Regions:
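Structured-RNA-binding interfaces characteristic of tRNA pseudouridine synthases
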Residues: 2-246
Length: 246
């Protein structure tokens, strides 16, 4: 759960680690507790590498992390011990020994994100921080608009200024809208995603719905390669990294 953390990655300022809770910070503290540094690791502290960066408030059910160690680890025992040390809102679900060539980020072939919306006029006690849309969403219109994003495109219109990779080209293999009761889920899967790309796509969908713009507006925004043409970047609450494929 990402609500109580300043994102997945340890934060630095002027070369020094900022004292703020992060998923990476909690994982590395737990690892240091469990793994006694061997002779070959004295000058190489345990460092975790994530499959991708998530912001404050973003949840993850499928985050993949790798680290190097020269110690022998028994998976079932290690998972139990890690989860005993970690805070209640972070857990390790699986552990595998991988080849030295494996890299959690660079070896990834696809990432699947899901954004959850509440489509209801009135709030309820257990809504939490999930974005609530008061007007009725037309799922068929939303799906047609999302279809313009399938395939390989330059997604510059949907990036935020924090995007570090110079390439803005992504290949989207899945873009679906699903409605279950008063919940609407946007499913997006692709080889890579730009910073805040999913949240801005959702914001553009809501702009199309809220202002009753033609569904072709999504195509125009995509082809403009201009962030100013897209909708707002919606709240991180409701966004979940569901799966990373290798």
């Amino acid at each position: 759960m990402g609500k109580n953390y300043a994102g997945s990655q340890i934060q630095f300022e002027n070369g020094k680690e900022i004292e703020t809770p992060t998923i990476q910070g909690e994982l590395e503290r737990a690892l240091r507790t469990l793994i006694k540094t061997g002779e070959s690791q004295r000058n190489r502290p345990i460092k975790t590498i994530f499959s991708g960066r998530t912001d404050k408030g973003v949840n993850s059910l499928g985050q993949v992390v790798h680290f190097d160690t020269d110690r022998t680890i028994v998976a079932s025992k290690f998972i139990y011990q890690m989860n005993e040390i970690l805070p209640d809102d972070i857990s390790v679900d699986n552990l595998r020994i991988v080849p030295d060539s494996f890299h959690a980020q660079k070896s990834a072939k696809a990432r699947y994100y899901r954004y959850e919306l509440i489509n209801r006029r009135y709030k309820q006690a257990f809504d939490g921080d999930i974005l609530r849309v008061k007007y009725e969403l037309d799922v068929e219109r939303m799906q047609t608009a999302l279809n313009f994003l399938l395939g390989e495109h330059d997604f510059s219109s949907f990036k935020s200024s924090g995007t570090l990779n110079p390439s803005k080209v992504c290949f989207i293999t899945r873009a679906e809208v699903e409605k279950l009761g008063d919940r609407v889920f946007i499913h997006l899967e692709g080889n890579r995603f730009l910073y805040n790309m999913v949240r801005t796509i959702v914001g553009t969908l809501l702009e199309i719905e809220g202002h009753k713009l033609p569904i072709e507006h999504m195509k125009k925004v995509l082809e403009a390669h201009d962030r100013r043409k897209a909708g707002q970047t919606v709240s991180p609450f409701g966004l979940t990294l569901m799966k990373v494929s290798y």
